[in-house]
Amino acid sequence: MASNGESKHSEVGHKSLLQSDALYQYILETSVYPREPEAMKELREVTAKHPWNLMTTSADEGQFLNMLLKLINAKNTMEIGVYTGYSLLATALALPDDGKILAMDINRENYEIGLPIIEKAGVGHKIDFREGPALPVLDHMLEDGKYHGTFDFVFVDADKDNYINYHKRLIDLVKIGGLIGYDNTLWNGSVAQPADAPMRKYVRYYRDFVIELNKALAADPRIEICMLPVGDGVTLCRRIS
């Protein structure tokens, strides 16, 4: 069991950008964990045992997404990048019983880790899971025509080198007034560090892609944006035209 704030942080909040581990732990223990649905807690604990657990959405971000979806009365949503399904479950629990989520990931095996928990929570019927790259699916939807402006919310937590390619397509699929959420837009804090600063190899590899995305979103007149230091940074884009 963790014996100090730093080790606790590495266990339960590895994506927090807060400077104080104790403060992040306070947020989790005071506001997040006491209100976390039992199914989300179970999935979080199962995911923590997975060797790629760094890929999961943090508990505080899951709580934020769940609240956000309720506030905008979302019903038709999309998620690109699912992993074990923690953020997907947060979404499914927030949607009405007839709500729908188009969920895409290249690895169904990871999704199936969380699927029994999702089904036990009674929300599996809301999810249409597609295994494989998302870009061809998005292109097909755009070509079809009937999906234009139909999504209330889209959450992207996938390959950072394709975020701009996703945005080019999603902007036409989300409705006017709808939201797109891009995860990891502060990318371990590396976006504010010099290019030659020491950082992990995978962080360095995707850093420039994230920086370019942030610049592109800030310059896009079709959206209003809000970058939040939740989890590893999430940027909300509200389509206005």
Swiss-Prot record:
Cleaved signal peptide residues: none
Modified residues (Blocked amino end (Met)): M1
Pathway(s) it belongs to: Aromatic compound metabolism; phenylpropanoid biosynthesis
One BP annotation, GO: methylation
Pfam families cross-referenced by the UniProt entry: Methyltransf_3
Induction details: By infection, plant wounding, or elicitor treatment of cell cultures.
Residues that bind substrate: K15, D157, N188
Keyword Plastid part of the UniProt annotation: no
Record carries keyword ATP-binding: no
Cofactor dependency: a divalent metal cation
Subunit structure: Homodimer.
Record PANTHER family: CAFFEOYL-COA O-METHYLTRANSFERASE 2, O-METHYLTRANSFERASE-RELATED
Function: Methylates caffeoyl-CoA to feruloyl-CoA and 5-hydroxyferuloyl-CoA to sinapoyl-CoA. Plays a role in the synthesis of feruloylated polysaccharides. Involved in the reinforcement of the plant cell wall. Also involved in the responding to wounding or pathogen challenge by the increased formation of cell wall-bound ferulic acid polymers.
Family per similarity comment: Belongs to the class I-like SAM-binding methyltransferase superfamily. Cation-dependent O-methyltransferase family. CCoAMT subfamily.
Record-given protein name: Caffeoyl-CoA O-methyltransferase
